[in-house]
């Protein structure tokens, strides 16, 4: 068994560890069970989760067993981490639906067959907890003074932190304890914003079970300016093809800044590090070849080789003028009766933008093009004159294209 710790370290995933030497030794000697938590607040994972999926896959390839914990119980409270407002509570039915969607997406790069990975829902043990017993067994081990120093709570104290949310750390710590008892799970992994919650679980297991437990956080996927990657004009970059088409997904990675290519190749592809270094060393116009490889590899992981190939062909057709391949571009279909309406209305109706206000915002910023002409008029009406042989071409920014076909 290769030591996955060295792989994770070389590729730059690791941010913080509870016990560095012990963790390296453990991962090299034994096959362990570890877990990562997923908050089921949407019916699709997004690029922010993709990094966690990659870490799970690297660990599994090295012989360790991933446990994907879906927060069906904690999701009914909401995690205050990184939030300035309290989250909306969800129904059991919404959470269950989202859990099923997550498993399908995780299965793209994680093998759930023959117990090689499992998915569990913390609603199974949290929803039937006896409050008095929970306070006596778990609450007694948590210091309020210490909890208040955690970053996730500090930012909320000024605005007001409900007791409901204050319980989140206890529940996440209890999750780790339950997984340790049921599945001999000895390590929790998560984004660096989860550090305080992970420490709470590690400490709880050591106190309750007198056993060793470990925690590891990894870097968040940020660009060279320190901003989280995976945001587009239309919102989050989703892994669900119905929310973000494979073409849009491909184009996002094809258009990353030169300074971000090396980091993305390391963190979100399985390319060997020698190949990552070779591609990252390309300069000038040649860096575009590295971006094409990045876009293809990431799209292939999430949407499969066939969709990645289609997206690649569509992108090349657009810049090479090969109209017959434009069918792979995100395309919306409208009726002739939909013409003679405001462009912003049409864009919202075709779901090219989540709302009219988003479309107006981009027009104001000078980033929206209709048939390659910049749109400056908020009240532009789309008529038959705008319909070309290939349809109506919409461009957002420099390289994000959509097509509207009139039937």
From Swiss-Prot:
Chain sites annotated for binding L-tyrosine: 35, 168, 172
The protein's GO terms of the molecular function aspect are: ATP binding; RNA binding; tyrosine-tRNA ligase activity
> Per the UniProt record, which EC number(s) apply here?
6.1.1.1
Q: What is its main location?
A: cytoplasm
Indicate which residues the UniProt annotation says bind ATP: 231
**Broadest EC class assigned to this enzyme:** ligase
Q: Name one GO biological process term.
A: tyrosyl-tRNA aminoacylation
List the CDD domains hit by this protein, alphabetically. Answer: S4 (cd00165), TyrRS_core (cd00805)
Query: Any idea where this protein resides?
Result: Cytoplasm
Give disulfide pairs as residue numbers. Answer: none
Residue positions of motif 'KMSKS' region: 228-232
The answer, when asked if ATP-binding is one of the entry's keywords, is yes
What NCBIfam families does the entry give? tyrS
Family designation:
Belongs to the class-I aminoacyl-tRNA synthetase family. TyrS type 1 subfamily.
The protein's matches in HAMAP family, at most eight in alphabetical order, are given as:
Tyr_tRNA_synth_type1
Q: What is this protein called?
A: Tyrosine--tRNA ligase
Q: Which gene encodes it?
A: tyrS
């Amino acid at each position: 068994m290769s030591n996955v710790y060295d792989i994770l370290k070389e590729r730059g995933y690791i941010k913080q560890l509870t016990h560095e030497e012990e963790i390296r030794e453990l991962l090299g000697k034994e096959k362990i069970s570890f877990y990562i938590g997923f908050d089921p607040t949407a019916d699709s994972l997004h690029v922010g989760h993709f990094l966690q999926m990659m870490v799970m896959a690297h660990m599994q390839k090295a012989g360790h067993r991933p446990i994907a914990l879906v927060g069906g119980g904690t999701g009914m409270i909401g995690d205050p981490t990184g939030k300035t407002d309290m989250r909306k509570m969800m129904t059991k039915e919404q959470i269950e639906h989202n859990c099923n969607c997550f498993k399908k997406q995780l299965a793209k790069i994680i093998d759930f067959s023959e117990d090689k990975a499992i998915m569990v829902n913390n609603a199974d043990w949290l929803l039937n907890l006896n409050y008095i017993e929970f306070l006596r067994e778990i609450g007694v081990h948590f210091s309020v003074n210490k909890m208040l120093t955690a970053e996730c709570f500090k930012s909320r104290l000024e605005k007001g932190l409900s007791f409901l949310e204050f319980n989140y750390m206890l529940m996440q710590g209890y999750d780790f304890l339950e997984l340790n008892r049921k599945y001999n799970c000895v390590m929790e992994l998560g984004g660096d914003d989860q550090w305080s919650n992970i420490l709470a679980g590690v400490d709880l297991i050591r106190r309750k079970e007198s056993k060793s437990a470990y925690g590891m956080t990894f870097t968040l996927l940020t660009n060279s300016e320190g901003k989280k990657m995976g945001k587009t004009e239309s919102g989050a970059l989703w892994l669900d093809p119905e929310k973000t088409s494979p073409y849009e997904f491909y184009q996002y990675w094809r258009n990353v800044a030169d300074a971000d290519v090396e980091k993305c190749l390391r963190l979100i592809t399985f390319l060997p590090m020698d190949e990552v270094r070779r591609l990252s060393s390309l300069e000038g116009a040649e860096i575009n070849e590295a971006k094409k490889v990045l876009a293809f590899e990431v799209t292939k992981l999430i949407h499969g080789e066939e969709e990645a190939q289609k997206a690649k062909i569509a992108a090349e057709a657009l810049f090479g003028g090969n109209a017959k391949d434009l069918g792979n571009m995100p395309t919306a279909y409208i009726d002739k009766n939909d013409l003679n309406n405001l462009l912003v209305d049409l864009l919202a109706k075709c779901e090219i933008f989540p709302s009219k206000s988003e479309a107006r915002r981009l027009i104001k910023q000078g980033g929206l093009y209709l048939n390659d002409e910049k749109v400056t008029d908020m009240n532009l009406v789309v008529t038959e004159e705008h319909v070309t042989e290939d349809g109506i071409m919409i461009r957002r920014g420099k390289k994000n294209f959509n097509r509207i076909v009139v039937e």
